[in-house]
Amino acid sequence: VEFPNDDAVLSHGFRFRPAWWTSRVPEGWGDFLDQLPAQERRYHRIARADLLTAATDHGLPQALVAGYVWGTGSSAFLVGRRARVFRDNDAQRVDDSLHAVAETLRVGNTVEAYTSMLRGQSQNLKHLGPSFFTKFLYAADAWNGRPGRALILDQFVAAALKSVDGWDISRNGPWDSSTYERWLDHAHSIADVEGVRADAVELAYFTHGRKIASES
């Protein structure tokens, strides 16, 4: 697995159209999307750097939106299904939940924050599973454009953990708290040894896992 440099990590991004999302999220939550770099044909670009600053610059609900936009990219056909989290949860409940989770992160309880968002737990939101709520954790835990302890865990990272490290892990999740804690320990340990950002490890595993998925 080859680890990307800082510039490659921060520029990791996708094209999208703000209009796909602004009509599907609570009023005001998607306004920042029009501020992102514009491209042709009403497209804009969202990069990992934008995700890392979303919570600080715009707010926690906006960080959740940013994670969905970044994680969906140009796949317009997926937007309707993925935006159900905003349609089927009360906006105040979402806001309260995200603030509670962010406070748990702030005091250093990363795994507890993850646990609280799992199905059946206190901060769980309908339709919001680990692949996307770990994007929120990653964004909310960031500081000055760098990750905190929280990292993204999705199907591609899971596939790479199985392939590269031989983990007995389901590709599609959901993943229990002990698996998330193990992933964080593993990624941060590799980052220390290799002298790279922890999210460079996550991106390397994501890239490898996506390659595996495309070949299967």
Give names to the regions the model predicted.
Residues 61-77, 135-139, 159, 203-206:
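Short, hydrophobic/amphipathic alpha-helical patches that form generic packing surfaces
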Residues 1-82:
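Structure-specific DNA junction-binding interface
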Residues 39-46, 111-114, 181-182:
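Short acidic alpha-helix initiation/capping motifs at coil-to-helix transition points
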Residues 52-53, 87, 188:
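Amphipathic alpha-helical segments within well-ordered protein domains
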Residues 56-59, 66, 71-125:
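Helix-hairpin-helix/helix-loop-helix acidic hairpins
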Residues 1-29, 134, 141-216:
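C-terminal accessory module of base-excision DNA glycosylases/AP lyases that mediates lesion recognition
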Residues 57-61, 91, 177-184:
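Generic detection of long, well-ordered alpha-helical segments
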